[in-house]
A protein has these predicted regions:
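Conserved, mostly hydrophobic/aromatic
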Residues: 49, 77, 116, 170, ...
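Core AdoMet radical
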Residues: 84-99, 106-127, 132-197, 206-213, ...
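Short, small-residue-biased leader/transition segments that mark boundaries at the very start
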Residues: 1-14
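Active-site-proximal loop/turn and secondary-structure-junction residues that shape catalytic pockets
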Residues: 67-69, 120-122, 149-153, 174-176, ...
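Catalytic cores of alpha/beta
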Residues: 153-160, 216-229, 285-297
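Generic structural signal for well-ordered alpha-helices
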Residues: 65, 103, 130-134, 157, ...
């Protein structure tokens, strides 16, 4: 058992150090960390998470080339700008040839991981996707292929894995059933989403999950449950970003989530899962000009510049004001490198696979 004689039981210092040592805290202690932490305690937390990330990954930050292949979606999530019933969304779907051209450019720039992201588009069937993945694997055998395509059948996940995909991102968003029902349409089920996550792990994917911070109806207790679920599930990747409203959704007038709370959660998750691959998200950069670097300084170790065709980027509009150009874009790599250098980091061009 962790020896706590050097600090007062329940004190801030003890709480932080126990989290770093034991990789978990009690629900009540996590709650206090999220609600009562003074600015200096949050900074200590970020510093501890930063050091853990540095021990595991050095000063390198992995880059992934993000390609948003379709903004069609069969779902009607109440927070999402590409929800099915948003008739104002300008829809697009990239051809396999366009996706391959994006990968070609990304490979030339130095990317060795590609992330294919999409709404749950019924047109992206297994035949199309397996053909695309096989061709990517044939042309760039040294690259990792990450998918973020939503909920699919076990047979589909297996076919995509066997075609050559390595990783799969599927954020659960919230582990609280009532909150999940508030955010999502009736046809979507939290149980099914969690089942998908376990299926992905069973098949052999490096699996990622995560949460949206500050979504309408979310409580601190919901966040504590999310932290404990992630701790128990042990994902290889963790995606966490603030809720940002989209004007053409039922939640269009709700306030955005807190950058500070997102950074606190990011640091907690780094201490819980020291070797996890944790991106500093575009949503952080959208809400705060220095948000992406603040995410790195809170323990993140991945960034995902946008490789999508510039004409389509603004159409993959999950929320208002999305940062998709400048240092957020693949063509802004020099700016990204400068920003990282200013905080003592640099781009790592390796595949960046998960390693315990």
């Amino acid at each position: 058992a962790y020896e706590i004689s050097e600090c007062l039981v329940g004190s801030e210092m003890c709480r932080r150090d126990r989290l770093k040592r034991n990789r978990t805290l009690s629900p009540e202690e996590l709650r206090l960390l999220l609600t009562d932490a003074a600015p200096e305690e949050r900074e200590y937390l970020h510093r501890a998470a930063r050091e853990v990330a540095r021990v595991h990954f050095g000063n390198g930050v992995f880059v992934r080339g993000l390609i948003e292949i379709s903004n069609y979606c069969r779902n009607d999530c109440r927070y999402c700008g590409i929800r099915r019933s948003n008739r104002l969304a300008e829809r697009y779907r990239l051809t396999p040839e366009t996706v391959l051209a994006c990968c070609e450019e990304g490979y030339r720039l130095g990317f060795r991981t590609f992330v294919l992201q999409s709404g749950e588009d019924p047109a992206l069937n297994d035949e199309l996707l397996t053909g695309l993945i096989r061709e990517m694997r044939r042309r760039w055998p040294d690259c990792a292929i990450t998918l973020s395509l939503g909920e699919r059948t076990e047979a589909s996940y297996r076919a995509l894995f066997e075609a050559g995909a390595n990783r799969y991102l599927l954020r659960h968003e919230t582990i609280t059933p009532d909150h999940y029902r508030w955010l999502h349409p009736v046809r979507m089920s939290l149980d099914h989403r969690i089942e998908c996550l376990h299926t992905l792990k069973k098949i052999g994917y490096q699996t990622g999950t995560g949460i949206m911070v500050g979504s309408p109806g979310q409580t601190v207790d919901d966040l504590v449950r999310d932290l404990l679920f992630i701790r128990e599930f042990e994902p290889q990747m963790i995606g966490i970003g603030p809720f940002i409203p989209h004007r053409d959704t039922p939640f269009g007038h709700e306030p955005a989530g807190s950058v500070e709370r997102t950074l606190t959660l990011l640091s907690i998750l780094r201490l819980m899962r020291p070797a996890a691959l944790i991106p500093s998200t575009t949503a952080l950069a959208t809400l705060s000009g220095d948000g992406r670097m603040r995410g790195i300084l809170a323990g993140a170790n991945v960034v995902m510049p946008n490789l999508s065709p510039p004409d389509e980027r603004s159409k993959y509009n999950l929320y208002d004001g999305k940062a998709a150009f400048g240092a957020e874009a693949a063509e802004g790599l020099a700016a990204l490198e400068r920003e990282l250098n200013e905080i003592g980091r640099h781009i790592s061009w390796s595949r960046g696979d998960y390693q315990e």
